[in-house]
Amino acid sequence: MDTRKVKSSSRDAVNCLPDEILAKILSYLPTKRAVSTSLISKRWRNLFALMIQLFESQHHLYLDDSDLVYPEEGKGEMKDVQESFGDFVDKTLTDCNTIKKLSILCPLKCCAHKDIDQWLHHAMERGVVDLDMRFKMGFTPTQNEWPCNVFTIKTLVKLTFRIEVGQNKMPYCPKGVLPVLKSLFLHAIWFACERLCHSMLPGCPILEELFLHDLRGYRYNDSPNFSISHKTLKRLTVHFNNSFELGRPMQFDTPSLLYLEYSGFAPCRYSRTSYLNSLVEVKLDVHIRHECNTHMHLSPIIDWIGNVKTLSLSPASVKMMYSRCVELHVFSNLVKLYFESNEKEGWEVLPRLLNKSPKLETLVLKGLHCASDHGVCVDRNEVKVLEIYGFSGCGREVRQVKCLLREMQFLQVMKVEIDAHDDNKKLRVINHLLDLPKRPSKFHIQFL
């Protein structure tokens, strides 16, 4: 059959569909693609508006400034493009009767305060439940220019918010009134940490998940404490950008916390961690700055991980443990350990951790090629599942695997991710692993 006839038949079949069916199809497309269909023909020009009318509660409105092509030169043209994007967002939101999920991303160019305020007003009026807004303002907003409306949308269940204001700090932290908010994600927010705890979090009475990424705040002398206090919080993620000169005192009052992920410098010795016994899983990426080491202390870190069932340690965390000769407590509840090190000294921490983890069942390793030539000796343990990532098949890796298999008498499965781009090399590594000394019949190897 002629190719042109097939294409023509396909177009005719689509065009024969009722407008309501086509609008339903558009509701499954990303907003940018759904809007672009208006260029197909006169009939398609109004289908996006029909989709908004019929399926607005099901569609995720995703609007970003890459929807428009930026001219390479000419400030006048750029201003026109920015205004055009603002008009497009404003018209799209105005055409909606209700909005459940909305994302507006303007990472490339600065947004005007009046536009942001208008978009938030539209979202608030239409009962938005899930809001994701990320933009830059190009200046430090005053209290009147800061988009406070975002923290007063009472229908919000999930809020993701990022604002870039250059190298200046936010002069204050707005009070939140978010009675049904359960998940709060803040990116690159520049205000003092204690103001977050005292001004914003009290307005989120049922908050369960708090994510603070690239948290900067004030310098050590201006804002000495990092404090999180919340009774219903279950998941907490804190990613500092390591801009602080010194370790900071940290205080946690989170009796319901189950998951903690922390990335940044080690806290100072005056930190107080209350109510962390409920923790089930902890991920640590803890750094230490040697010129400031008198201010940083590891006892708070050990307190965090004392009762967890799942623990993840980054190379920086492992380095911190061996460089400071940390005395480890018994991890009486630990059943799964993620361990990664890119230095041979770091692998000396692994036997100590295994000896302190009597209930450990799953061990996940990465960076095995950095272990010493003679391998790391471990005592017999209860591990049943061993996972190895980035295995290239070098001699020291193979020797280390043999050592682990010899002491893991209860091991049932070993999962290995082969790091080889060449298929022939990958096959050689697989055959090498399969030729290792035979184990009991219950043991088997899986390749990831």
Curated annotation (Swiss-Prot):
One of its GO terms (cellular component) is vacuole. SMART domains: FBD, FBOX. Signal peptide: none annotated. LRR repeats lie at residues 82-106, 185-214, 215-240, 310-341, 342-367. It comes from the Eukaryota. Keywords: Leucine-rich repeat, Repeat. Residues 11-58 form the F-box domain. This is Putative F-box/LRR-repeat protein At5g25860. It comes from Arabidopsis thaliana (Mouse-ear cress).
